[in-house]
Amino acid sequence: MSVCYRPPGNETLLSWKTSRATGTAFLLLAALLGLPGNGFVVWSLAGWRPARGRPLAATLVLHLALADGAVLLLTPLFVAFLTRQAWPLGQAGCKAVYYVCALSMYASVLLTGLLSLQRCLAVTRPFLAPRLRSPALARRLLLAVWLAALLLAVPAAVYRHLWRDRVCQLCHPSPVHAAAHLSLETLTAFVLPFGLMLGCYSVTLARLRGARWGSGRHGARVGRLVSAIVLAFGLLWAPYHAVNLLQAVAALAPPEGALAKLGGAGQAARAGTTALAFFSSSVNPVLYVFTAGDLLPRAGPRFLTRLFEGSGEARGGGRSREGTMELRTTPQLKVVGQGRGNGDPGGGMEKDGPEWDL
């Protein structure tokens, strides 16, 4: 693609020094937090084989860590790009690297949406829990997620171009292509999944309050987790997609108008907003620690598997450890009592009925 539509002003990803500096700082911090964090998640869950099979939620979290870790491995390239102000890998590398980034973005978004939907169904439709534990279902869902991500990421490679042999950035043959691509990306990677997440967590919280969980310690933990997940996704991705929409609208505006010139400002701000979005790949392990609470000092490095063991999806029944979230199917909906301790290895288990993961 030799001819690229460019907004007025001739700005590039490297035009604003502030955007380059903040982008570099965000990338370094994201890698510092996310690489060891996601590596720990993979180490904890990849080799975990409970007797009844790995819970669906744990499998989704494992693949989420793989997707997030893959894109964080590319941070040295982007840091070099921003600091040296020149793309280091040529035209083929420009397309390939951004394709991997888009693949990771879509996989992470789809997996997060599935996690939200799984927890919502576990609360509102507990009779579906046996099906949600099926390994065959997990394989089909993961295959669908990765195939969808592979397809949705294709435009990221098609519309990337090495401009003047030094700037790897979006290159659309016409304003219509630019508006369509950027709008579709925001719709599929933010608006629809974020709407699903908000809807699922709203329904989940409403059901938990209806079960009189809202005022107890379990309800407080669930509320903090829900708020953290929704806020992290929205806050970290909103600036990136705001730039998308700004450039999409500017592409269709009259070339001499003020709105068209804002498209150039969005292009220059893209480096910083893209780097901020990298934090979405590093915050999930922090949220798992946040969720574990008192389970972390008691269970040590295995707190993540203990967290899923306590969810009720990994076993047929048992006492709820403090800090886990369960619903038990009995003639009446009730909260499972606390065990001997939060994550205490000595906590006994009793087989008294199925429990459903939230």
Swiss-Prot record:
Residues bearing carbohydrate: N10
Keyword Membrane attributed: yes
Tissues showing expression: Widely expressed.
Ranges facing Cytoplasmic side: 46-60, 118-140, 207-224, 297-358
Region (Disordered): 311-358
Recorded superkingdom: Eukaryota
Membrane topology: Multi-pass membrane protein
Transmembrane annotation, as ranges: 25-45, 61-81, 97-117, 141-161, 186-206, 225-245, 276-296
Single GO MF descriptor: G protein-coupled peptide receptor activity
UniProt GO BP: chemotaxis; keratinocyte migration; negative regulation of adenylate cyclase activity; neuropeptide signaling pathway
Coiled-coil intervals: none
Intervals, Extracellular compartment: 1-24, 82-96, 162-185, 246-275
Entry-linked Pfam families: 7tm_1
A single GO cellular-component term on record: plasma membrane
Annotated compartments: Cell membrane
Family membership: Belongs to the G-protein coupled receptor 1 family.
Role according to the record: Low-affinity receptor for leukotrienes including leukotriene B4. Mediates chemotaxis of granulocytes and macrophages. The response is mediated via G-proteins that activate a phosphatidylinositol-calcium second messenger system. The rank order of affinities for the leukotrienes is LTB4 > 12-epi-LTB4 > LTB5 > LTB3.
The protein's name: Leukotriene B4 receptor 2
Organism in which the protein naturally occurs: Homo sapiens
